[in-house]
Swiss-Prot record:
Belongs to the UTP25 family. One of its GO terms (cellular component) is nucleolus. The gene is NOF1. Residues 80-93 have a biased composition (Basic and acidic residues). Disruption phenotype: Abnormal female gametogenesis and altered embryo development with a disturbed cellular division pattern. Increased rRNA expression and hypomethylation of rRNA promoters. This is Protein NUCLEOLAR FACTOR 1.
Amino acid sequence: MAPNATGVLKRHRSHEKFDKKRDTKKHKHVEKTIVSNPSTDSPEESSIEAESEAMVYREPTQYQNLLVSLGSSNKVVADMNKRRQREEEGKSDTEEDEDDEDEDEEENSGSDDLSSTDGEDDKSQGDDQETLGGLTDDTQEDNDNQSEEEDPDDYETDEEVHELSTNGQSFVDASSSISAFSEHLSHKLSSEEVETLPKGKWKFKWESPAFDMPNCKWKGTSENFLDGIQSDAPYGLKPKLYNHWLQLYKKCGGKDLDSSKRRKFFSICNSYLDILHSNKKPFYHCGSDEDSSAMDAYLMHSLNHIFKTRDLVKKNESKIAKHRETSEEEILSDDGFLDQGFTRPKVLILLPLRSIAFRVVKRLIQLTPESQRVNVEHLDRFNDEFGCEEDTDDCDGEKTTSKNGNSIKQKSSKPSDWQALFGANNNDDEFMLGIKHTRKSIRLYGDFYSSDIIVASPLKLHMAIGAAEENKERDVDYLSSIEVLVIDHADIISMQNWSFLATVVDYLNRLPTKQHGTNVMRIRPLYLDGHARFYRQSIILSSYLTPEMNSLFGRHCLNYKGKMKMACEYKGVLEKVLLPVRQIYERFDAASITQVDDARLEYFTKKIFPKIKDSVQGGVMIFIHSYFEFVRLRNFLNTQNTSFCLLGDYAKNADISRAREQFFVGSRKIMLYTERAYFYKRYKIRGIKNLILYSLPERKEFYPEIMNMLEEGSHDMMSTALFSRFDMLQLERIVGSTSAKRMITSEKNMFAFC
């Protein structure tokens, strides 16, 4: 299969029920008559002839080519393909073409081989063997499962599935009460949706106040469901999951789960809409309760999704096993048995740091019902590689102790948020972990193709994608069937390399390059049609909004269900500036967002730089948001023979120490300092007499921190900030939404705050 995101695979098979026979002789006679007796007497008859010939001699589809390719190395698939072709031609299992008698005999032999193979597989796998997604567990799990009892609750499904019948009725008949899971994946896209969804044009139709956030509101593209949100337990959760969550919530001091933020956000997640939550107060800003509420919600949603997926597959496998006398291909002619993707992983959680992944995975384990986590495989290895602590309590994983029992927090001059993020030794950004849920255990470090959930950093997945592009023997096909994507702490990811994240999201739901043991006869049509990206739910969580997040959400999150995003009003942070600094804001004009960078540099070189070039005072710090801007400004200063030093993203510690000293003593008059360098290092710079914000920081808390670095006692302390109308998001977080709107629309282009 070619890794083409827009490719289409078609499943061609009979829509008749498996126990209904066709009048194949009549069908064959009509077809031969039309083809062998062409008429040229009238245009109408010529048209009929052309149409008939088109039906007989049509080009093979990508799906047919796929089956042929897979059949060349897999006899079972080859036999299935032959029978499928025979069905399309209107032939029964016993009827043979006169011209292809030998070939049909070989097909019938293949049918016997297939039945024999299936029987042998059943015996070898055993009753306890799990075969989700066409992938079987390894020998170790076989041994683990042999001693386990069958638990009826493990197979419960919210969409009630009736018993198979043999009187011509459908194998699967969903009840009138269909879960959000079933309703979402069973939807069939219209031709209009297929045409319009890739364009990424969305119109937000409604607004509704956000729960417990008086300054925020939700906006949505589809119908407003918040007022009529499901208010009765278990809120779409599997009962076992809900009961465990409720018990855990009460154990941690919670009184009313039903009206809690975490339950309400779970209901939003369970709507299967794409979600952009841009006002999550993170745990490192003393927002552990709000952060854990959102985390609980998307983790419960993820568990609910993979458990319902597993239950549906196991139910269908059980029903197929009860009807071994009926050929599997005929059973699978019922759409109710199309329950799988190309590969098993269904949930992808992207996180920026290993320490955050540790926190999320520990909570995922806690939220799993105890009967389904009797054993957590490789937990010690996980603690060693991801954590710096022996244990966490069951209340959102907030209790932190080091391996030797001492507190991991150490005295530091760094701010508390930096200590929470980077104070330990588990903050690297290169990791990937497969998590597999079996009936009574959780397997960490599972093979990615046999995992249910993948937790990874954008960097690690970007590296895997690059390796697959260079080496055709490697692949990232485990990303082909992701149905729920969670991007948590997107604000921290934006301080890394956003392009890595964009690349990963772009690679999701592409056609796989290999089969990976998948039963192609049970793949959902949405995958074969190349529409998986239109069904993928994307949940993005951040403490603030950036243009890059807006772009990703609008262009790469194409869920047919629609979108919800948060819009907030800000008060600003100017009051947190403790020094008497005269803060000047200068607006420059840019025709479009693609011209902003050039317009900013031009304004700086013509309006700002001449004022500081010949200054004898020195102590000028230029704060820059992005590394791209940093490089352009550095190159410009080099052409001006300016005395300056650098504190950039990739500066070595020795160079940083030298630059700080040179700036403080005045041997270098100008310092360039990037927001990313400040985010990771938090160096307090001494000797600042004049502050220029070449571009506004994304993180609003950085603004007063940088302002308060100005040398107290300096004569006429002043700062200058450049902005354009395209900087509205950053500007409103700093000066407040009301002031920002006035500054963007005013005829004046200079504003002062004292």
